[in-house]
Amino acid sequence: MSEIGTGFPFDPHYVEVLGERMHYVDVGPRDGTPVLFLHGNPTSSYLWRNIIPHVAPSHRCIAPDLIGMGKSDKPDLDYFFDDHVRYLDAFIEALGLEEVVLVIHDWGSALGFHWAKRNPERVKGIACMEFIRPIPTWDEWPEFARETFQAFRTADVGRELIIDQNAFIEGALPKCVVRPLTEVEMDHYREPFLKPVDREPLWRFPNELPIAGEPANIVALVEAYMNWLHQSPVPKLLFWGTPGVLIPPAEAARLAESLPNCKTVDIGPGLHYLQEDNPDLIGSEIARWLPAL
């Protein structure tokens, strides 16, 4: 495996969305179907820095920073999932994207799947990894992260950990990558959240995870897009790693059997942020898959 790059060699682009500026990467040819890369918590378009170069020679690659994250503006919001839906919907319309291929991860997967379910005629393919799915009980949450995420979801304790101590950036993120993240990489991820007041989205997201039936509105939304995925013929590309976090190998095997038109790719060792452990394989497999769509 080649050395994993730490640089972010992309010019900044901004678009006004619902009165705020959202930052995004935009590279590659303008003809053909654009590929929309959606990150999750607590990351940004930086997560895709070593994957986009594999895809950009042939396809337009667009990677926004979700509202309140990365280089996007940080309005005074509660940062519920529905807030992100509103801003992402408006972002896609502001850029005039008629059809897209989605490349999605973590909460970016929930946003992407939810958008695809509502706009199926505009989706040519979905590549996904470590995506948000209903977790029926805490026993199915990875043991190494169980107590931490239960604490994140305990009102005062969770805010102390994530808002005051920055525990999602300093703890959860590096613990969910197999290799050690460098200080340069960690500083890229720290940069948007140096001030506690800006960490609201980092706290909200783990409290929206659909675990053990709560919160009910997110469980229902995620179950709805999972039902759609199991019925939709849209081409799917699922990356998984060992041991994984949200999609362990056994779950990947079940999905390979149950999802129509789904190809799976084993990236080797990986936890949650697979893009930080084997980006070249992910990027090259996406580039190989796209021409058939």
Curated annotation (Swiss-Prot):
One of its GO terms (cellular component) is membrane. Its EC number is 3.8.1.5. It is an enzyme of class 3 (hydrolase). Residues 34-158 form the AB hydrolase-1 domain. GO terms for molecular function: haloalkane dehalogenase activity. Catalyzes hydrolytic cleavage of carbon-halogen bonds in halogenated aliphatic compounds, leading to the formation of the corresponding primary alcohols, halide ions and protons. This is Haloalkane dehalogenase. It comes from Rhodococcus sp. The gene is dhaA.
